UniProtKB/Swiss-Prot annotation:
Organism: Capra hircus
The encoding gene: IL4
Subcellular location: Secreted
SMART domains per the UniProt record, alphabetical: IL4_13
Keyword Lipid biosynthesis: no
Protein name: Interleukin-4
Major site of localization recorded for this protein: secreted
Signal peptide: 1-24
Function summary: Participates in at least several B-cell activation processes as well as of other cell types. It is a costimulator of DNA-synthesis. It induces the expression of class II MHC molecules on resting B-cells. It enhances both secretion and cell surface expression of IgE and IgG1. It also regulates the expression of the low affinity Fc receptor for IgE (CD23) on both lymphocytes and monocytes. Positively regulates IL31RA expression in macrophages. Stimulates autophagy in dendritic cells by interfering with mTORC1 signaling and through the induction of RUFY4.
Coiled coil (UniProt feature): none
Residues listed as glycosylation sites in the UniProt record: 62, 96
Superkingdom of the source species: Eukaryota
Stored PANTHER family: INTERLEUKIN-4
Disulfide bonding pattern of the chain: 27-135, 48-85, 70-105
Length: 135
């Protein structure tokens, strides 16, 4: 019995340390996948890259990063659902981005300036690389 009481604190410590490692590692893997997809997408010579999208980065200054990622996901979904191009990559990017985004947000296209899909992806790539460097 004495050995069991000595093992409990060690096991708890091991469990806590492991959970911190896994959490940080998950962040790295998700960001790595997003950056990899963005690199592939931005190197594409595809007419879809010039499609107009809402400038999700022109949001109010008090918008959170999660809200911005949510709006980016909405625009990506709009492109790959309405246009038959880059579906595999845009769908994968949308799935990975949703893990970093808030669950609900809105894109008011009437008041939002427009950009191209290429510009959206390039800005997103810059943000993700900065985020990865801090992770």
């Amino acid at each position: 019995m004495g050995l069991t009481s000595q093992l409990i604190p060690a096991l708890v410590c091991l469990l806590v340390c492991t959970s911190h490692f896994v959490h940080g590692h998950k962040c790295d893997i998700t960001l790595e996948e997003i950056i990899k997809m963005l690199n592939i997408l931005t190197s594409q010579k595809n007419s879809c890259m010039e499609l107009p999208v809402a400038d999700v980065f022109a949001a109010p200054k008090n918008a959170t990063e999660k809200e911005t990622f949510c709006r980016a996901g909405i625009e990506l979904r709009r492109i790959y659902r309405n246009h038959m191009c880059l579906n595999k990559f845009l769908g994968g990017l949308d799935r990975n981005l949703s893990s970093l985004a808030s669950k609900t947000c809105s894109v008011n296209e009437a008041k939002t300036s427009t950009s191209t899909l290429r510009d959206l992806l390039e800005r997103l790539k810059t943000i993700m690389k900065e985020k990865y460097s801090k992770c």
